[in-house]
Amino acid sequence: MSMPDAMPLPGVGEELKQAKEIEDAEKYSFMATVTKAPKKQIQFADDMQEFTKFPTKTGRRSLSRSISQSSTDSYSSAASYTDSSDDEVSPREKQQTNSKGSSNFCVKNIKQAEFGRREIEIAEQDMSALISLRKRAQGEKPLAGAKIVGCTHITAQTAVLIETLCALGAQCRWSACNIYSTQNEVAAALAEAGVAVFAWKGESEDDFWWCIDRCVNMDGWQANMILDDGGDLTHWVYKKYPNVFKKIRGIVEESVTGVHRLYQLSKAGKLCVPAMNVNDSVTKQKFDNLYCCRESILDGLKRTTDVMFGGKQVVVCGYGEVGKGCCAALKALGAIVYITEIDPICALQACMDGFRVVKLNEVIRQVDVVITCTGNKNVVTREHLDRMKNSCIVCNMGHSNTEIDVTSLRTPELTWERVRSQVDHVIWPDGKRVVLLAEGRLLNLSCSTVPTFVLSITATTQALALIELYNAPEGRYKQDVYLLPKKMDEYVASLHLPSFDAHLTELTDDQAKYLGLNKNGPFKPNYYRY
């Protein structure tokens, strides 16, 4: 049974008809305007950046920026912080000054500073522990006289760390440890605030080393502390400016890759200053490496590939804290997860967590996603890549770009096709495609973001490590690699507990005596495995 047409109220029918005519006229007028607007063509780069050799001056153009903008850069573009010429001119060829007249920096666009400042302020809201440390120690200025040269990811979270170091009395010069992880607007905000920062998203390898060199090689300014992430800064100083180490009081290193390089130097007797291994501190291993990766692996994969995880077969290479975080997230969304491991202890942990431990060769033909988390080199070789199924996704959650043999894919018979920012299709002669993310570099910071609160824990640990090394009396630390004192780990954790309204139980005198502990800690021996 059909319903009768609705009857308009008396006197309203003609008004509705006129309103409809006006609405139609406006709609067609708008459509005509849209039709006349010229269509913008997406520009794809003809040549891929070759990272096996230093490019020429004309080869310094940002690869990622010439193709597509990151999620954060799109906001700044919409707010008219950038113009089309920014993608054509290398920051090294620009003459920029901040509002104070200083040009002691090199960033993508200093006009992005206002937007970057808002990003930093947002990050500060979830980094209350670092802000608390800044307020507690600001009067004492424990880093007064410190000249810190840093090479880390330059994000809103690390900007909070850098500005905390400055508030505690340090002078800082900074570069990026990854060519894709810099937030341009944040770098601009730091430059506007007076920090000598040399970094932008999409640097070439030549740019990367140039930025590090500008931080170290400065007339009238010599660093006495190093904060490194990956060991590239430390390597550059050893290679180019070994005399700088005469004034360096210590190195703080936060990544497994950089720590490995420090231990190699120590073993060879070439480590000439004390170094603090932040990566293996409890507050880095058990929080940043685990929880940060558990959340950011999914974010990075979703943003780049729109992949559905349920039912997908995924192999994760390495079951350390990073691997554990990745596997937990993938398993929770229904992925079928395999593990590769060299360590029988980690392998047994994987088995008891419900994962199959396999050799990569055994599953490489069937898996949909390959993730590396080892800190090693050539974990995924050209042979593995040749045997992968069509549309297999390959990415890295370790620090450096050595885990996947990307260099072996730069051959004439393979075609590279950039399909979106940080996503390349590598096409074999038979038409097979492998989806390579961030050119084998760190997925989460290259393609997405990471949880601010977790980074607050790591940043606070780094700040305390710098304070400890800088103020340590002569002789406390020798030319070796050290772990952060347990008491400092506990202090970092205690600063973050108020965010959860958590309240610690206090030992009685009798209980403390029974356990042989100080009531105020440390509560665990150095050999304790959390």
Curated annotation (Swiss-Prot):
Assign the protein's first listed, main location to one coarse class: endoplasmic reticulum
What this protein needs as a cofactor is: NAD(+)
Provide the protein's localization.
Answer: Endoplasmic reticulum; Cytoplasm, Cytosol; Apical cell membrane; Microsome
Q: Please list the GO terms describing molecular function.
A: enzyme regulator activity; identical protein binding; RNA binding
Give residues where N6-acetyllysine occurs: 40
| Entry-annotated residues carrying N-acetylserine | 2
Gene Ontology biological process: angiotensin-activated signaling pathway; apoptotic process; epithelial fluid transport; mitochondrion-endoplasmic reticulum membrane tethering; one-carbon metabolic process; positive regulation of sodium ion transport; protein export from nucleus; regulation of monoatomic anion transport
Regions of compositional bias (Low complexity) in chain numbering = 64-83
Quick one: effect of changing residue 90 to A? No effect on interaction with ITPR1. No effect on phosphorylation. No effect on interaction with SLC4A4. No effect on interaction with FIP1L1
What is the protein name stated in its UniProt record? S-adenosylhomocysteine hydrolase-like protein 1
